[in-house]
Amino acid sequence: MLPIVDTHQHLWDLSQFTLPWLESDGVEMLRKDHLMRDYLETSANANVARTVYMEVDVAPADRLAEAQFVTELCRRDDNPMAGAVIGGRPGEVGFREYISQFKNNHFIKGVRQVLHVPDTAPGYILNADFVKGVQYLGELDMIFDLCLRPGELADAVGLVNQCPETYFILDHCGNADPNIINGDVPHDPENPVSHSKEQWQDDMSTLGEHEQVICK
C-alpha cells in the first residue's frame, strides 16, 4: 500500500484546552477527547507515514496550550506527527509577537484562522492589518491555511495577490458544496455559505494560477 501523509490531522485533549464550537448543535458526538492513541488505532491499516496537525479552533486563551500540545507530540517518536499548523488571527493586535515565539520551532509550519463563521464578515481578510499579518508569516517562512466561505474565494485571490512571499494552503477545495457543483442543488443568494458553480470554478482557476497556492 502506498504510504500516506495525512496533511489535516485533528486531535484534541479537553483537559488541556477548550473548543467553544463543541457547544454548537449537531456536534454532540465530538464532545470527547480525540487523542493520538485514538488516531493510531483508527488508522492502523491505512499505512500513514506522516501527519501534519491542523488547528481545531480552540478558545483564544488556549492557543499557546494547543501549540505546546502539538510540539510535544512532534518531538516524540511513538507517533507519525511531523509538523503542525496552529491557530492564530493575523489581523489581531499582538499577532506578530504571538507567532514570533515559534520562529525557531521547526515543527510549527503555519497558521490557520477559521473564517467561515458568522462573526467574520465578507472582505475581512482584505483588511490592512490582516494582510500585514499574513505577509509576516511569509517572512517567517510559515504558511497560511485558507478556510473560508466558498462565495468569498475572490477575497482569497485578493489576499494572495498582496502576499507574494507567503505560501497558502486552500483547505477543503474552497469548501464548495458538492451538490451545487453536481447541479443537484441551486445556488441560494440568501444563504451566506452558498455559491454558484461558475463562481467557484472561476475563483479556483484564478487561485490555481498562483504558484504559492496549494489546494487540498
Question: Where are the regions a protein language model picked out?
Answer:
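Active-site mouth loops of central-metabolism enzymes
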Residues: 23-31, 55-60, 85-91, 117-125, ...
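Short aromatic-enriched loop/helix-cap "lid" or pocket-rim segments at secondary-structure transitions
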Residues: 14-20, 66, 96-98, 123-124, ...
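Acidic (Asp/Glu)-rich catalytic clusters
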Residues: 39-47, 68-80, 97-109, 126-139, ...
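Catalytic pocket-lining loop regions of alpha/beta-barrel enzymes
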Residues: 123-216
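Structural preference for beta-strand elements that scaffold enzyme active sites
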Residues: 3-6, 49-52, 81-85, 108-112, ...
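Structural motif corresponding to alpha-helix initiation and N-cap regions
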Residues: 33-36, 64-67, 92-96, 127, ...
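Active-site beta-loop-alpha junctions enriched in small/polar residues
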Residues: 10, 56-57, 86-91, 113-117, ...
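An N-terminally biased module of ancient metal coordination in phosphate/nucleic-acid-related enzymes
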Residues: 1-71
